[in-house]
Amino acid sequence: MINLRQQIPHYLRLMRFDKPVGIFLLLWPTLWAVWIAAKGAPSFKIAVIFIAGSVVMRAAGCIVNDFADRHLDKHVQRTQMRPLASGSVSVTEAMLLFAVLSLIAFTLVLLLNRLTVELAVIGILLALVYPFLKRFTHLPQLWLGIAFSWSIPMAFAATVGHVPAVAWLLFFAAVLWPIVYDTQYAMIDREDDVKVGIKSTAILFGRYDRLMIGLLQGSVLLTFGLLGWYLRFNYWFYLGLLVALGLMCYQQFLIRHRKPPDCFAAFRNNNWVGFFIFLGILLTYRN
Protein backbone atom coordinates (compact mmCIF):
# COMPACT_ATOMS: atom_id res chain seq x y z
CA MET A 1 0.00 0.00 0.00
CA ILE A 2 1.45 3.37 -1.03
CA ASN A 3 1.77 5.96 1.73
CA LEU A 4 0.96 9.02 -0.37
CA ARG A 5 2.16 11.52 2.22
CA GLN A 6 5.58 9.86 2.40
CA GLN A 7 5.83 9.57 -1.38
CA ILE A 8 4.98 13.17 -2.27
CA PRO A 9 8.59 14.43 -1.75
CA HIS A 10 9.82 11.63 -4.03
CA TYR A 11 7.20 12.52 -6.66
CA LEU A 12 8.28 16.16 -6.55
CA ARG A 13 11.91 15.11 -7.07
CA LEU A 14 10.86 12.83 -9.93
CA MET A 15 9.18 15.82 -11.60
CA ARG A 16 12.28 17.96 -10.81
CA PHE A 17 10.33 20.56 -8.88
CA ASP A 18 13.38 20.75 -6.62
CA LYS A 19 15.33 22.01 -9.68
CA PRO A 20 13.14 24.73 -11.21
CA VAL A 21 15.79 26.03 -13.63
CA GLY A 22 14.58 23.46 -16.17
CA ILE A 23 11.09 24.93 -16.03
CA PHE A 24 12.43 28.36 -16.94
CA LEU A 25 14.59 27.01 -19.77
CA LEU A 26 11.42 25.60 -21.30
CA LEU A 27 9.34 28.64 -20.39
CA TRP A 28 11.48 31.40 -21.93
CA PRO A 29 11.07 30.30 -25.59
CA THR A 30 7.36 29.90 -24.90
CA LEU A 31 7.11 33.45 -23.59
CA TRP A 32 9.17 34.80 -26.49
CA ALA A 33 6.65 33.28 -28.89
CA VAL A 34 3.52 34.23 -26.94
CA TRP A 35 4.60 37.89 -26.81
CA ILE A 36 5.83 38.14 -30.40
CA ALA A 37 2.78 36.35 -31.82
CA ALA A 38 0.50 38.79 -29.99
CA LYS A 39 2.71 41.81 -30.79
CA GLY A 40 3.29 42.44 -27.11
CA ALA A 41 -0.31 42.07 -25.93
CA PRO A 42 -1.08 38.37 -25.39
CA SER A 43 -4.47 37.34 -24.09
CA PHE A 44 -4.55 36.34 -20.45
CA LYS A 45 -6.06 32.97 -21.37
CA ILE A 46 -3.34 32.02 -23.86
CA ALA A 47 -0.54 33.23 -21.57
CA VAL A 48 -1.84 31.19 -18.61
CA ILE A 49 -2.39 28.06 -20.72
CA PHE A 50 1.12 28.15 -22.15
CA ILE A 51 2.79 28.91 -18.83
CA ALA A 52 0.89 26.12 -17.07
CA GLY A 53 1.48 23.80 -20.01
CA SER A 54 5.23 24.40 -19.86
CA VAL A 55 5.36 23.52 -16.17
CA VAL A 56 3.24 20.38 -16.62
CA MET A 57 5.02 19.12 -19.74
CA ARG A 58 8.45 19.68 -18.24
CA ALA A 59 7.41 17.55 -15.25
CA ALA A 60 6.01 14.85 -17.55
CA GLY A 61 9.17 14.94 -19.66
CA CYS A 62 11.35 14.40 -16.60
CA ILE A 63 9.34 11.30 -15.72
CA VAL A 64 9.76 9.86 -19.23
CA ASN A 65 13.47 10.67 -19.14
CA ASP A 66 13.99 8.94 -15.80
CA PHE A 67 11.93 5.94 -16.92
CA ALA A 68 14.09 5.54 -20.02
CA ASP A 69 17.33 5.99 -18.04
CA ARG A 70 16.41 4.14 -14.84
CA HIS A 71 18.91 1.31 -15.45
CA LEU A 72 21.66 3.61 -16.75
CA ASP A 73 21.24 6.17 -13.97
CA LYS A 74 22.38 3.60 -11.41
CA HIS A 75 25.86 3.69 -12.95
CA VAL A 76 26.26 7.48 -13.09
CA GLN A 77 27.28 9.11 -9.82
CA ARG A 78 25.19 12.26 -10.29
CA THR A 79 21.98 10.38 -11.13
CA GLN A 80 22.12 7.19 -9.08
CA MET A 81 19.82 8.60 -6.39
CA ARG A 82 17.06 9.67 -8.75
CA PRO A 83 13.71 8.28 -7.53
CA LEU A 84 13.29 5.59 -10.21
CA ALA A 85 16.95 4.57 -10.21
CA SER A 86 17.05 4.31 -6.42
CA GLY A 87 13.68 2.56 -6.15
CA SER A 88 12.03 5.22 -3.99
CA VAL A 89 9.35 5.51 -6.71
CA SER A 90 8.09 2.45 -8.59
CA VAL A 91 7.61 2.29 -12.35
CA THR A 92 3.86 1.94 -11.80
CA GLU A 93 3.74 5.08 -9.65
CA ALA A 94 5.77 6.98 -12.24
CA MET A 95 3.51 5.94 -15.11
CA LEU A 96 0.38 6.88 -13.17
CA LEU A 97 1.86 10.28 -12.39
CA PHE A 98 2.81 10.71 -16.05
CA ALA A 99 -0.76 9.84 -17.08
CA VAL A 100 -2.18 12.47 -14.71
CA LEU A 101 0.19 15.15 -16.01
CA SER A 102 -0.58 14.21 -19.63
CA LEU A 103 -4.30 14.48 -18.93
CA ILE A 104 -3.81 17.95 -17.44
CA ALA A 105 -1.74 19.06 -20.43
CA PHE A 106 -4.26 17.66 -22.90
CA THR A 107 -7.12 19.39 -21.09
CA LEU A 108 -5.26 22.70 -21.30
CA VAL A 109 -4.57 22.40 -25.02
CA LEU A 110 -8.21 21.50 -25.75
CA LEU A 111 -9.06 25.06 -24.72
CA LEU A 112 -7.22 26.26 -27.84
CA ASN A 113 -7.92 25.93 -31.57
CA ARG A 114 -7.65 22.78 -33.68
CA LEU A 115 -4.28 23.60 -35.27
CA THR A 116 -2.75 24.07 -31.83
CA VAL A 117 -4.15 20.72 -30.70
CA GLU A 118 -2.67 19.02 -33.79
CA LEU A 119 0.71 20.62 -33.15
CA ALA A 120 0.49 19.54 -29.50
CA VAL A 121 0.22 15.90 -30.56
CA ILE A 122 3.50 16.27 -32.48
CA GLY A 123 5.02 17.96 -29.43
CA ILE A 124 4.09 15.03 -27.19
CA LEU A 125 5.69 12.58 -29.63
CA LEU A 126 8.86 14.67 -29.69
CA ALA A 127 9.01 14.61 -25.89
CA LEU A 128 8.41 10.86 -25.71
CA VAL A 129 11.12 9.97 -28.23
CA TYR A 130 13.89 12.22 -26.88
CA PRO A 131 15.01 10.18 -23.83
CA PHE A 132 15.71 7.10 -25.94
CA LEU A 133 17.83 8.84 -28.60
CA LYS A 134 20.98 9.08 -26.48
CA ARG A 135 21.47 5.34 -27.03
CA PHE A 136 21.55 5.69 -30.82
CA THR A 137 22.86 9.14 -31.78
CA HIS A 138 25.32 11.75 -30.55
CA LEU A 139 22.72 14.43 -31.32
CA PRO A 140 19.99 14.01 -28.68
CA GLN A 141 20.55 17.69 -27.83
CA LEU A 142 19.29 18.64 -31.29
CA TRP A 143 16.10 16.68 -30.69
CA LEU A 144 15.79 18.29 -27.26
CA GLY A 145 16.05 21.68 -28.93
CA ILE A 146 13.21 20.81 -31.29
CA ALA A 147 11.07 19.41 -28.45
CA PHE A 148 11.74 22.36 -26.12
CA SER A 149 10.99 24.85 -28.91
CA TRP A 150 7.81 23.24 -30.19
CA SER A 151 5.75 25.61 -28.07
CA ILE A 152 6.74 28.35 -30.53
CA PRO A 153 4.66 27.20 -33.53
CA MET A 154 1.94 26.25 -31.04
CA ALA A 155 1.88 29.77 -29.58
CA PHE A 156 1.58 31.35 -33.01
CA ALA A 157 -1.13 28.87 -34.02
CA ALA A 158 -3.08 29.64 -30.85
CA THR A 159 -2.72 33.41 -31.30
CA VAL A 160 -3.04 34.06 -35.05
CA GLY A 161 -4.45 30.76 -36.34
CA HIS A 162 -1.42 29.82 -38.45
CA VAL A 163 2.37 29.54 -38.22
CA PRO A 164 4.03 32.40 -40.17
CA ALA A 165 7.62 32.52 -41.40
CA VAL A 166 8.73 34.64 -38.45
CA ALA A 167 7.67 31.84 -36.11
CA TRP A 168 10.06 29.44 -37.83
CA LEU A 169 12.89 31.99 -37.62
CA LEU A 170 12.32 32.24 -33.88
CA PHE A 171 12.03 28.45 -33.74
CA PHE A 172 15.45 28.07 -35.40
CA ALA A 173 17.11 30.32 -32.81
CA ALA A 174 15.32 28.52 -30.00
CA VAL A 175 16.39 25.07 -31.27
CA LEU A 176 20.06 26.05 -31.24
CA TRP A 177 19.93 27.39 -27.69
CA PRO A 178 19.20 24.07 -25.89
CA ILE A 179 22.06 22.47 -27.84
CA VAL A 180 24.29 25.04 -26.14
CA TYR A 181 23.13 24.54 -22.58
CA ASP A 182 22.53 20.80 -22.77
CA THR A 183 26.03 20.30 -24.18
CA GLN A 184 27.34 22.21 -21.16
CA TYR A 185 25.20 19.94 -18.98
CA ALA A 186 26.43 16.79 -20.76
CA MET A 187 30.03 17.86 -20.12
CA ILE A 188 29.38 17.15 -16.43
CA ASP A 189 28.79 13.43 -17.00
CA ARG A 190 30.97 12.90 -20.07
CA GLU A 191 33.30 10.32 -18.52
CA ASP A 192 30.47 8.30 -16.96
CA ASP A 193 28.41 8.52 -20.16
CA VAL A 194 31.25 7.04 -22.22
CA LYS A 195 31.49 4.11 -19.81
CA VAL A 196 27.77 3.23 -19.97
CA GLY A 197 27.32 3.93 -23.68
CA ILE A 198 25.30 7.15 -23.51
CA LYS A 199 25.88 9.47 -26.48
CA SER A 200 25.83 13.27 -26.48
CA THR A 201 27.11 16.33 -28.29
CA ALA A 202 29.66 16.77 -25.48
CA ILE A 203 31.18 13.42 -26.50
CA LEU A 204 30.80 14.15 -30.22
CA PHE A 205 32.51 17.55 -29.98
CA GLY A 206 35.31 16.21 -27.76
CA ARG A 207 38.16 18.70 -27.33
CA TYR A 208 36.37 21.10 -29.67
CA ASP A 209 33.41 21.40 -27.27
CA ARG A 210 34.06 25.03 -26.30
CA LEU A 211 34.56 26.04 -29.92
CA MET A 212 31.33 24.35 -31.02
CA ILE A 213 29.41 25.84 -28.10
CA GLY A 214 30.78 29.26 -29.06
CA LEU A 215 29.74 28.84 -32.69
CA LEU A 216 26.27 27.79 -31.58
CA GLN A 217 26.00 30.72 -29.18
CA GLY A 218 26.99 33.08 -31.98
CA SER A 219 24.41 31.50 -34.27
CA VAL A 220 21.69 31.98 -31.65
CA LEU A 221 22.49 35.67 -31.28
CA LEU A 222 22.86 36.18 -35.03
CA THR A 223 19.46 34.61 -35.67
CA PHE A 224 17.88 36.76 -32.98
CA GLY A 225 19.50 39.81 -34.55
CA LEU A 226 17.95 38.86 -37.89
CA LEU A 227 14.60 38.38 -36.16
CA GLY A 228 14.84 41.82 -34.57
CA TRP A 229 15.68 43.41 -37.92
CA TYR A 230 12.78 41.60 -39.63
CA LEU A 231 10.31 42.72 -36.95
CA ARG A 232 11.84 46.21 -36.70
CA PHE A 233 12.46 45.89 -32.98
CA ASN A 234 13.94 48.90 -31.22
CA TYR A 235 17.14 49.28 -29.21
CA TRP A 236 15.70 47.60 -26.10
CA PHE A 237 15.74 44.25 -27.87
CA TYR A 238 19.35 44.68 -28.92
CA LEU A 239 20.32 45.71 -25.40
CA GLY A 240 18.82 42.40 -24.26
CA LEU A 241 20.91 40.59 -26.86
CA LEU A 242 24.01 42.49 -25.71
CA VAL A 243 23.47 41.29 -22.14
CA ALA A 244 22.91 37.76 -23.48
CA LEU A 245 26.23 38.03 -25.33
CA GLY A 246 27.96 39.03 -22.11
CA LEU A 247 26.42 36.08 -20.29
CA MET A 248 27.51 33.68 -23.02
CA CYS A 249 31.07 35.01 -22.80
CA TYR A 250 30.90 34.40 -19.05
CA GLN A 251 29.77 30.83 -19.72
CA GLN A 252 32.82 30.31 -21.94
CA PHE A 253 34.96 31.52 -19.05
CA LEU A 254 33.24 29.12 -16.66
CA ILE A 255 33.75 26.02 -18.82
CA ARG A 256 37.35 26.83 -19.77
CA HIS A 257 38.73 24.01 -17.56
CA ARG A 258 35.70 21.74 -18.12
CA LYS A 259 35.24 21.13 -14.39
CA PRO A 260 31.78 19.63 -13.64
CA PRO A 261 30.71 22.27 -11.07
CA ASP A 262 31.67 25.06 -13.49
CA CYS A 263 29.88 23.38 -16.40
CA PHE A 264 26.78 23.11 -14.22
CA ALA A 265 27.07 26.80 -13.31
CA ALA A 266 27.28 27.65 -17.03
CA PHE A 267 24.20 25.53 -17.70
CA ARG A 268 22.23 27.32 -14.98
CA ASN A 269 23.40 30.71 -16.23
CA ASN A 270 21.39 30.16 -19.41
CA ASN A 271 18.26 30.96 -17.43
CA TRP A 272 19.44 34.58 -17.41
CA VAL A 273 20.13 34.47 -21.15
CA GLY A 274 16.50 33.51 -21.75
CA PHE A 275 15.28 36.12 -19.27
CA PHE A 276 17.16 39.05 -20.80
CA ILE A 277 16.09 38.13 -24.32
CA PHE A 278 12.50 38.07 -23.08
CA LEU A 279 13.00 41.36 -21.25
CA GLY A 280 14.26 42.90 -24.49
CA ILE A 281 11.14 41.68 -26.30
CA LEU A 282 8.88 42.93 -23.50
CA LEU A 283 10.44 46.40 -23.42
CA THR A 284 10.42 46.66 -27.20
CA TYR A 285 6.65 46.35 -27.26
CA ARG A 286 6.23 48.75 -24.34
CA ASN A 287 8.26 51.55 -25.93
From Swiss-Prot:
| Localization of this protein | Cell inner membrane
Q: Does the keyword Magnesium apply?
A: yes
Q: What highest taxon heads this organism's lineage?
A: Bacteria
Q: Does the keyword Chloroplast apply?
A: no
The reaction(s) catalysed by this protein are: all-trans-octaprenyl diphosphate + 4-hydroxybenzoate = 4-hydroxy-3-(all-trans-octaprenyl)benzoate + diphosphate
Question: What InterPro entries is this protein classified in?
Answer: HB_polyprenyltransferase-like, Prenyltransferase, UbiA_prenyltransferase, UbiA_prenylTrfase_CS, UbiA_sf
Question: Pfam families of this UniProt entry?
Answer: UbiA
**One Gene Ontology molecular-function label:** 4-hydroxybenzoate polyprenyltransferase activity
A cellular component term, taken from the record's GO annotations: plasma membrane
Q: Give me the segments passing through the membrane.
A: 21-41, 44-64, 91-111, 112-132, 139-159, 160-180, 211-231, 235-255, 263-283
Which Gene3D superfamilies has this protein been placed in?
UbiA prenyltransferase
Q: In which pathway does it act?
A: Cofactor biosynthesis; ubiquinone biosynthesis
Q: Which UniProt keywords apply?
A: Cell inner membrane, Cell membrane, Magnesium, Membrane, Transferase, Transmembrane, Transmembrane helix, Ubiquinone biosynthesis
The GO biological-process annotations, alphabetized, read as: ubiquinone biosynthetic process
EC number(s) recorded for this UniProt protein:
2.5.1.39
Q: Which coenzyme or cofactor does it need?
A: Mg(2+)
Recorded topology in the membrane: Multi-pass membrane protein
Protein family: Belongs to the UbiA prenyltransferase family.
User: Its function?
Assistant: Catalyzes the prenylation of para-hydroxybenzoate (PHB) with an all-trans polyprenyl group. Mediates the second step in the final reaction sequence of ubiquinone-8 (UQ-8) biosynthesis, which is the condensation of the polyisoprenoid side chain with PHB, generating the first membrane-bound Q intermediate 3-octaprenyl-4-hydroxybenzoate.
Against PANTHER family, the record matches this protein to: 4-HYDROXYBENZOATE POLYPRENYLTRANSFERASE, MITOCHONDRIAL, PRENYLTRANSFERASES
Q: Which NCBIfam families match?
A: ubiA_proteo (TIGR01474)
Name it. Answer: 4-hydroxybenzoate octaprenyltransferase
Organism of derivation: Coxiella burnetii (strain CbuK_Q154)
